[in-house]
């Protein structure tokens, strides 16, 4: 059984579903509504001034006021009268707003031998259960609603076979430790030893999903809507019902490349007709003649190619470099800890054997205790590095991947624009050929009319030298040719060139409209990702890496001091013996 086999409509909660009015997700008026007393949710009619997409869009339209994008705000304001958007949340600190905690991961059976894993989420005084497929659905919706915003990642899909067995066959409590705890292996996610890969996978999933929700709660753009509040609301037990009853979400295009980036809930026909390039599209689409649709990449395009390369290199260095080798070091220290513990037992047994010797047995006992204490100190270090260093590094790798998704989104929009340029060039070439054919036909008609206008005399006299048989053969030959011409004309009659020209001209106008929309979208997306999203990501990335390295230095320093103290005590004991 895999995560793909999960049904998205299997949320677990005893509370009844309160469908949102107007087909929207304004169940509790944002995240703040989750902490309110239980009862019928108050559905607020959304007015246009509270629409975060309009506010979000206007902040990016201003730099491009000279382009054709300036009308997006007005067009969207006319179409958005309802939806999932809730009034903006009041400004509050992270402590006031609270943090999400996943209390446990449990296996739930739905009959006929089918089962799935649910995660019990605690937020303020509310508890709700969600399954992995619902987290996945939430992220996909957020990517469409906020195509220019970095949406945090969720853990990758895994097989549920061993995953479910590890949960069902264990009495462990799968919770994250408090921030004040030592965060070692014993109290990390499972209250007990963490030696099984299945249990490590559970720890990894819970941490990633917890971080996913908390990062969303810290995102001002996302929290202006009610979608996170609805996801954490126990009244919305069935997340699939919430999605299907929302007219706003149901109206979103299947592909984010066909969404209006300034207002995805207001997708115009021009956006809906945009082509979808393949994921492997190169920045320059080549024609049949080997010539790109644009003569030369712009400086902006070259800059984004460089940024994409740097982010890919950063992700690679982090994953195959720092994270990889730090895991290896952690594993080595874990093995060393076990060796020290075994050595302590060996010295203890040796001390028992030498108990008659007096001084030697005492020294061996001191040495056994020193190795045992060293093993305990090293075990504490391993736990802190595993939880506070390795797992945050793993999360940083996934976050870097989410940042590259934004860059890839911009690259695909660039490829989309080039596809339209290539299509426009092809249609214009076709129109030119049709017009040339029309001109040639007109020239021939003029020559024929001119020739007929000169007047000709028809000789009805029978040729004297021609024999009757020869004349008959010529007559039948001309008749057969005429019959063939009529047959071909009836069977393979071509469309009127004027109709073809009109059709191609209409296609060109439609492509030009789509090209204008695509080019305008690309300008907005480029400015937003380059000037807002990526700099913010870089600042957060640097701060998180700084905290990781600071903790690493702190843990190693504390370990070195404790370890040195152990062996200093051993030397004093030997000197006093």
UniProtKB/Swiss-Prot annotation:
Binding site for a 1,2-diacyl-sn-glycero-3-phospho-(1D-myo-inositol-3-phosphate): 131, 133, 157, 205
Protein family (similarity comment): Belongs to the sorting nexin family.
A GO-annotated cellular component: phagophore assembly site membrane
Region feature (Disordered): 57-81
Main location: membrane
Note on domains (UniProt): The PX domain binds phosphatidylinositol 3-phosphate which is necessary for peripheral membrane localization of ATG20 to the perivacuolar punctate structures.
Stated name of the protein: Autophagy-related protein 20
MF terms in GO: phosphatidylinositol-3-phosphate binding
Gene3D superfamilies: Arfaptin homology (AH) domain/BAR domain (1.20.1270.60), Phox-like domain (3.30.1520.10)
Annotated S-S bridges: none
Gene: ATG20
Topology with respect to the bilayer: Peripheral membrane protein
CDD domains for this protein: BAR_Atg20p, PX_SNX41_42
Keyword Protein transport: yes
UniProt cross-references to InterPro entries, sorted A to Z: AH/BAR_dom_sf, PX_dom, PX_dom_sf, PX_Snx41/Atg20, Sorting_Nexin_Autophagy
Residue stretches making up the PX domain: 95-239
Keyword annotations of the record: Autophagy, Endosome, Lipid-binding, Membrane, Protein transport, Transport
Matches recorded under Pfam families: PX
Organism: Eremothecium gossypii (strain ATCC 10895 / CBS 109.51 / FGSC 9923 / NRRL Y-1056)
GO biological process, one term: autophagy of mitochondrion
Biological role: Required for cytoplasm to vacuole transport (Cvt), pexophagy and mitophagy. Also involved in endoplasmic reticulum-specific autophagic process and is essential for the survival of cells subjected to severe ER stress. Functions in protein retrieval from the endocytic pathway.
PANTHER family for this protein: AUTOPHAGY-RELATED PROTEIN 20, SORTING NEXIN-41
Localization (cell): Endosome membrane; Preautophagosomal structure membrane
């Amino acid at each position: 059984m895999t995560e793909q086999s999960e049904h998205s409509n299997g949320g677990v909660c005893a509370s009844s579903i309160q469908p949102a009015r107007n087909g929207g997700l304004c169940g509790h008026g944002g995240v703040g509504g989750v902490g309110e007393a239980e009862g019928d949710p108050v559905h607020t009619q959304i007015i246009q001034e509270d629409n975060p997409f309009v506010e979000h869009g206007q902040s990016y339209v201003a730099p491009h006021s000279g382009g054709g994008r300036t009308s997006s705000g007005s067009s969207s304001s006319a179409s958005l009268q309802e939806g999932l958007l809730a009034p903006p949340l009041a400004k509050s600190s992270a402590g006031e707003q609270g943090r999400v905690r996943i209390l446990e991961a449990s296996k739930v059976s739905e009959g006929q031998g089918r089962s799935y894993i649910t995660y019990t989420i605690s937020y303020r005084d509310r508890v709700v259960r969600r399954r992995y497929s619902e987290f996945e659905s939430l992220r996909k919706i957020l990517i469409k609603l906020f195509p220019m915003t970095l949406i945090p990642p969720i853990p990758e899909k895994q097989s549920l076979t061993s995953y479910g067995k590890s949960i069902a066959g264990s009495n462990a409590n799968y919770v994250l430790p408090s921030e004040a705890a030592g965060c070692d292996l014993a109290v990390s996610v499972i209250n007990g030893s963490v030696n099984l890969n299945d249990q490590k996978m559970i720890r990894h999933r819970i941490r990633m999903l917890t971080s996913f929700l908390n990062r969303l709660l810290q995102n001002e753009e996302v929290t202006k809507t009610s979608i996170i509040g609805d996801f954490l609301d126990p009244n919305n037990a069935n997340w699939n019902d919430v999605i299907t009853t929302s007219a706003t979400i149901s109206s979103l295009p299947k592909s984010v490349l066909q969404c209006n980036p300034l207002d995805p809930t207001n997708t115009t026909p021009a956006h809906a007709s945009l082509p979808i390039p393949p994921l492997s599209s190169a920045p320059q689409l080549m024609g049949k003649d080997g010539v790109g649709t644009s003569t030369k990449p712009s400086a902006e395009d070259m800059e984004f190619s460089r940024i994409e390369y740097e982010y890919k290199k950063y992700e690679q260095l982090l994953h195959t470099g720092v994270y990889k080798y730090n895991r290896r070091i952690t594993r080595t220290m874990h093995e060393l800890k076990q060796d020290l513990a075994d050595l302590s037992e060996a010295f203890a047994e040796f001390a028992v054997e030498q108990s008659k010797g007096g001084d030697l047995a005492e020294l061996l006992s001191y040495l056994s205790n020193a190795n045992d204490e060293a093993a305990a100190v090293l075990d504490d270090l391993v736990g802190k590095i595993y939880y506070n260093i390795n797992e945050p590094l793993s999360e940083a790798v996934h976050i870097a991947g989410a940042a590259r998704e934004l860059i890839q989104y911009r690259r695909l929009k660039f490829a989309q624009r080039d596809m339209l340029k290539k299509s426009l060039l092809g249609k214009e070439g076709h129109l030119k050929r049709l017009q040339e054919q029309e001109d040639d036909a007109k020239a021939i008609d003029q020559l024929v009319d001119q020739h007929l206008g000169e007047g000709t005399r028809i000789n009805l006299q029978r040729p004297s030298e021609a024999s009757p048989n020869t004349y008959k053969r010529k007559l039948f030959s001309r008749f057969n040719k005429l019959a063939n011409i009529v047959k071909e004309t009836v069977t393979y009659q071509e469309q009127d060139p004027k109709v073809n020209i009109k059709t191609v001209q209409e296609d060109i106008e439609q492509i030009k409209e789509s090209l204008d929309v695509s080019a305008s979208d690309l300008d907005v997306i480029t400015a937003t990702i380059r000037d807002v999203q990526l700099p913010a990501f870089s600042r957060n990335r640097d701060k998180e890496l700084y905290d990781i390295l600071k903790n690493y230095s702190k843990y190693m320093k504390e370990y070195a001091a404790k370890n040195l103290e152990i062996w200093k005590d051993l030397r004093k004991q030997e000197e006093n013996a």
